[in-house]
From Swiss-Prot:
Ca(2+) binds at D39, D166, I167. Component of the tRNA-splicing ligase complex required to facilitate the enzymatic turnover of catalytic subunit RTCB. Together with DDX1, acts by facilitating the guanylylation of RTCB, a key intermediate step in tRNA ligation. GO terms for biological process: tRNA splicing, via endonucleolytic cleavage and ligation. One of its GO terms (cellular component) is tRNA-splicing ligase complex. The modification N-acetylalanine is found at A2. InterPro entries: Archease (IPR002804), Archease_dom (IPR023572), Archease_dom_sf (IPR036820). It holds the Pfam family Archease. Component of the tRNA-splicing ligase complex. Gene3D superfamilies: Archease domain. This is Protein archease. Belongs to the archease family. GO terms for molecular function: metal ion binding. It comes from Bos taurus.
Length: 167
């Protein structure tokens, strides 16, 4: 298990990528990757449910690239809703994945959940980042889809979430 804030994947960064990484303060990491047959399970946690969702989004993006090499040049907002906390987490991650894979090729350095309405299962979030570029960002593993398989949301004293991503 990685320590909080520790980079868990080796992207063999160039000097230029290391310089970008050194330019900005590191973003808190409260997540880990768990082995799963043919896929990857994200485990994220936080002091609040909002932080656990944020960390899960960053775990997903951290699997695709070293988010420390991303500069916060643009801002993107994502709002979505679900029928319960699990579907809310699914749609939240799916909307962020869409921003990366189909829409603007946006990769965030940081995602912040502004609000989770637990009564109506709505979420508002914002991300700071830039357009993904292979010449600038190290390539990790493509995330094809979010799955409901074995998804868990624990909204207790220490909120945590588990999500399997299709790679």
């Amino acid at each position: 298990m990685a320590l909080e804030g520790e980079d868990v994947r080796d992207y063999n960064l160039t000097e230029e990528q290391k310089a970008i990484k050194a330019k900005y303060p590191p973003v808190s990491r409260k997540y880990e990757y768990l082995d799963h047959t043919a896929d990857v399970q994200l485990h994220a946690w936080g002091d609040t449910l909002e932080e656990a969702f944020e960390q899960c989004a960053m775990a997903m993006f951290g699997y695709m690239t070293d988010t420390g090499t991303v500069e916060p040049l643009q801002t993107i907002e994502v709002e979505t809703q679900g029928d319960d906390l699990q579907s809310l987490l699914f749609h939240f991650l799916d909307e962020w994945l869409y921003k990366f894979s189909a829409d603007e090729f946006f990769i965030p350095r940081e995602v912040k959940v502004l609000n989770i309405d637990q009564r109506n299962f709505k979420i508002r979030s914002i991300g700071w980042g830039e357009e993904f570029s292979l010449s600038k960002h190290p390539q990790g593993t493509e995330v094809k889809a979010i799955t409901y398989s074995a998804m868990q949301v624990y909204n207790e004293e220490k909120p945590e979430v588990f999500v399997i991503i299709d790679i």
